[in-house]
């Protein structure tokens, strides 16, 4: 009986240590999940505004071709680029930690500056005497690639969140199993103690 008590105490201590480790791991996993969810929410705004850049630029080009100048729309696009590249401006945009996206955004931003020069040329000489249509098509493809890069980054975060959630579930399952094992061991020990008491009473 004494050996069983020692074995029970030893196993209880081991289970307690494992439980503490699993709880600590669970806390860390939950923190990582929260951080990645926050990143995912910020990424959604970036994707939205990157898509708006694509659409708004096409609209600006069409307006210029039809001789409807819109400097406010150009300023609006400039502000979005400031937000996307430097997290400046009024749009509360986050910086995506993805090199491919930033490389494509840099190329797109540089090409936007060239496109603005071409818009100025359209106003001075008419769109027939410029390369505005071809440039806008190239720009659209660049913008599409930039949005795709942001979407790929977003998907990677989503996959990471799903993986962390799965690990959290497994962690909690292990905790439940340990609690069940601990409960069964305690019940077994309780039964043994009662049997010992009964024997002691009978012997007396």
Give short role names for the model-derived ranges.
Residues 1-9:
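Short, Lys/Arg-rich, polar N-terminal cytosolic tail immediately upstream
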Residues 9-36, 169, 173-176:
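Extreme N-terminal signal-anchor transmembrane helix of membrane signaling/transducer proteins, especially
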Residues 9-15, 150-169:
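Membrane-interface helix-start motif
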Residues 35, 39-50, 69-70:
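Membrane-proximal amphipathic alpha-helices
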Residues 47, 52, 56-65, 103-162:
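Extracytoplasmic
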Residues 63-121:
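Extracytoplasmic ligand-binding sensor domains of the Cache superfamily
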Residues 159-192:
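Alpha-helical transmembrane signal-anchor helices
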Residues 191-204:
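Amphipathic HAMP/coiled-coil signal-transducing linker helices
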């Amino acid at each position: 009986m004494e050996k069983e008590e020692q074995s029970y105490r030893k196993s209880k201590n081991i289970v307690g240590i494992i439980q503490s480790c699993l709880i600590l791991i669970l806390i860390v996993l939950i923190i990582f999940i929260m951080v990645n969810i926050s990143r995912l929410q910020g990424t959604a705004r970036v994707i939205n505004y990157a898509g708006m850049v694509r659409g708004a630029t096409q609209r600006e080009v069409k307006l210029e071709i039809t001789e409807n100048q819109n400097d406010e729309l150009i300023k609006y696009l400039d502000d979005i680029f400031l937000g996307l590249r430097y997290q400046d401006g009024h749009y509360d945009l986050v910086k995506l930690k993805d090199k491919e996206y930033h490389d494509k955004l840099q190329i797109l931003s540089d090409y936007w500056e060239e496109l603005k020069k071409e818009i100025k040329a359209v106003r001075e000489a008419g769109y027939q005497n410029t390369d505005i249509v071809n440039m806008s098509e190239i720009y659209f493809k660049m913008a599409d690639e930039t949005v795709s890069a942001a979407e790929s980054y977003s998907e990677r975060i989503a996959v990471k969140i799903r993986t962390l959630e799965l690990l959290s579930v497994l962690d909690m399952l292990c905790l439940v199993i340990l609690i069940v094992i601990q409960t069964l061991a305690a019940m077994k020990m309780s039964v043994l103690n009662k049997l010992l008491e009964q024997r002691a009473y009978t012997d007396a």
